[in-house]
A protein has these predicted regions:
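Rossmann-fold scaffold of SDR-type NAD(P)-dependent oxidoreductases
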Residues: 61, 134-142, 165, 188
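Conserved glycine-rich Rossmann-like NAD(P)H-binding loop of the short-chain dehydrogenase/reductase
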Residues: 80-95
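Non-catalytic terminal and boundary segments that flank Rossmann-like NAD(P)-dependent oxidoreductase
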Residues: 1-54, 183
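Conserved mid-core segment of classical short-chain dehydrogenase/reductases
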Residues: 6, 20-21, 116, 121, ...
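Amphipathic alpha-helical dimer-interface segment in Rossmann-like NAD(P)H-dependent oxidoreductases
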Residues: 73-74, 125, 129, 164-184, ...
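Catalytic Tyr-X3-Lys loop
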Residues: 151-170, 187
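Catalytic loop of short-chain dehydrogenase/reductase
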Residues: 142-143, 185-196
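Canonical Rossmann dinucleotide-binding motif of NAD(H)/NADP(H)-dependent dehydrogenases/reductases
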Residues: 51-83
């Protein structure tokens, strides 16, 4: 099996070098990173921080695993205090927290269903209460239900996807923006699924 294909010819290149590993697809949303074998790499130990984010506070949604965990660890390495939100992946979130704190940074781990506007406001409020600032908001959480055809997408799936991947980003930004100072950053992410 191969990972999702980031570009044409990727699978052929993997086969040429004998690169294979077990399937990483999980039926549940969100997935559980601790079940993946081999586990994804979230940081490069050869990279040293330079303190570029010292004194800053960041909120990374979906920060328990994947891209979110990698961002959380990179920001901590650069000196930021890091808050992560996640839905229900408690074990993954605890591991991210452990790794952020191992870098000597403050951390906050917040379970939240960000499909609800009130949860977005509560999450941002908790970050402001803990760190007394929010300099970087990374909207990274998402669901991805890959379907072969638009005809296979039901109303519930469509609604859940829009609530999670679009409306919640709006709610988070709306909650965070009044407390963010000039020069702060709002970042949104996507994954390879957008290109399949």
């Amino acid at each position: 099996m191969y990972p999702a294909y980031p570009y044409r010819g990727y699978r052929r290149e993997c086969e040429q070098v004998g690169l294979t590993f077990p399937p990483q697809h999980q039926e549940r949303q969100p997935g559980l990173e601790y079940l993946m074998d081999p586990p994804p790499l979230a940081e490069n130990p050869a990279v040293r921080g330079s303190g570029r984010l010292a004194g800053k506070a960041a909120l990374i949604t979906g920060g328990d695993s994947g891209i979110g965990r990698a961002v959380a660890l990179a920001f901590a390495r650069e000196g930021a205090d890091v808050a992560i939100s996640y839905l229900n992946e408690h074990k993954d979130a605890a591991e991210t927290r452990r790794r952020v704190e191992a870098q000597g940074r403050g951390s906050l781990v917040l379970p939240a269903d960000l499909r609800m506007e009130s949860e977005c406001a509560r999450t941002v409020g908790r970050v402001m209460d803990r760190f007394e600032r929010l300099d970087i908001l990374v909207c990274n959480h998402a669901v991805q239900y890959v379907q072969p055809s638009i005809l296979d997408i039901g109303a519930d799936q469509l609604s859940d996807t829009f609530q999670t991947n679009i409306l919640s980003y709006f709610y988070l930004i709306q909650a965070a923006l009044p407390g963010m100072e000039r020069g702060s950053a709002i970042i949104t992410t996507t994954s390879i699924t957008a290109y399949q």
